[in-house]
Amino acid sequence: MAESMGKRYEDVQDVLKHHMMNRRGALRAGLGFGAAVLFGGSALSACSSGDGGGGTYAGNTKKPAPDEGGGGAPIGKANIPTPRDKTVIIGQVDFQVFNSFNPMIPNGSQGGNGFDTMVREYMFYLNLPTGELIPWLATGYEYNADFTTLTFKFDPNAKWNDGEPLTSEDFKFSVLLRRDNPALLGGGGNAKDFIANIQTPDPQTAILELSKPNPRLHYDYICSIVASFDILPKHIWEKEDPTKFKDNPPVRTGPYMLDKAIPNQKMYVYKKNPNYWNKAKLDPAPEFVIFQSTATSQDAASQAFKRAEFDVGSLDEQHAKQLRSEGYEKLITTPFNDPCPRALWPNHDPARGIISDPRMHHVISYLTDRDKIGKSVWPVETPPAQYPWANYDGNQKWEIPAVADKYKLEFSPQKAEALLDEMGATKNAQGKRMWKGKPATIEVITPAPVDGAEYIIGQTVVTELKKVGIDANVRSYTGSVHSEKWERGEFDISSQWCCQMSQDPGQLYNYFQTRYAKKVGENAVGRNQVRLKDPELDTLSKQLDNLDPESAEAKPLLEKALDEYYQNLPVIPVIQTNYPAYYNTTFWEGWPTEDDLYNVPNNWWGQFMFVIGRLKPTGQK
């Protein structure tokens, strides 16, 4: 059986190796995490240290006067219902949902509100910067020789915040709930494809009996990017309809509990769980953690940060540079490179008109000036993306230059026009492109605000489309509205991010399988929102699902699958990106820095729980 793993560095082959990289080399690469707009922070960019005499990437040692922030800035009074010196305040996106914490239904839970990081916990955490796999709710896992059973052991000390023990029965209930309800967000998927039965011989043991071998099923239970499998308390959820239950207040196992949500302040207040089960390993100093929407004006948000009314976020790189130049000494900027390039997602459903033709996807690619976007849209230069995954050192093994060179993602309006003519989308007397007797039109949607990078990327493409005779526009929607349109296929192109590959390309190809394609207007429940139907890619993907991706048997299949992907371009890579984290050291110290990147620094990732656990009060009142 799977025993406690203790301190372990991720030699689990395909998780860490495909996430990790030489850290400093990666910082130079200019990557970024795509869910920043949806899960936290405005559309930020990689940042430079600048020449200002203030905050740096490693922090400063000079201390301001007791009632001043860095650079002599006065400390403001944060509008919060808790003692400031006992509270960490995190600036976040515009919150909309305050009365529901059910992530399995549309608009059932607000992304980036702290629930995923402070209240929920996961079976395992992958610390990307260090490479350590951290067992948490589970203590270990083990496969049998032919990968047809997967055994998890759970920590006998784990308890829900209502005092009930977490057991293997909770895990079994949670897995089967999703397996047997594919309409739920996160439903179906690998659980439906692979898990035939679950045995629970004792409260700490769950044995997954698989319908076919799968050496990578444990990936689903590791918090590697943002979040992971959410174990639900059976004693609560078995009495509820999962399609309607709001789960408010949420019962989970984390070190914090929901104290209150304050809609008119767009604020969530979390308080320490006095009976937290894992205090021996994690006993955070802050009594409260608040996630709050920042001001819509970046100038106002920056001033709030300068007055130490926020400890995390509430800043973009433009204003961070300004604070440095002013000598603001309490700013720490920590760059972090994550797995999601910026990308354009074209809809494949014929109901959406010209965009459904795969040739139009190549037109869009030819009209995407990646060099310009990488140099001017992101505040620091970031490289173009050729593959639909991050250019980590560990991902180089998945690159196939012989295939990529056939489909070079280049900026060429001339090739775009020639391809449009070849498609029959010729210009009328007014210079407008026609498609099947009607004017060709394309709308780009994005969850980014109008000054966000994803919006600007969409705008650059719209500008080029107009030049070649296609009426086009770009629209910004709030996260919840965009999410609904995205899942229902009610878009032509979505400008956002591509986070579908965290371990190997087989994950991306599985995501696009035809069985997940729904009619426009139906919820895609988290997969194949672009409605791709590609039988050849389906066949290759299903073969790859059962293979070690680094095996000799998988190599030719990966090559064919990449070629098939490029032919259809169901997601169009744009640039690699970087999201720096901004911290204020007025009230709290111990933040991750470039020189001490002890864990993932992004506040919307599950691993941020460990950052909160490292903080110490400065003594500022």
Question: What name fits each language-model region?
Answer:
Residues 188-237, 366:
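Surface-exposed binding/hinge segments that line
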Residues 89-145, 176, 251-253:
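N-terminal lobe/hinge region of extracytoplasmic solute-binding protein
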Residues 81, 148, 362, 374, ...:
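Extracytoplasmic/peripheral linker and loop segments enriched in polar/acidic and small residues
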Residues 72, 384-429, 448-456, 553:
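Structural transition elements
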Residues 583-621:
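Long beta-strand-rich cores associated with HINT superfamily self-processing modules
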Residues 109, 114-117, 127-132, 224-283, ...:
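Gly/Pro-rich hinge or "lid" segments in bacterial periplasmic/extracellular proteins
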Residues 155, 244-247, 275-323, 362, ...:
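Ligand-site clamp/hinge motif
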Residues 1-25, 35-42:
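N-terminal secretory signal peptides
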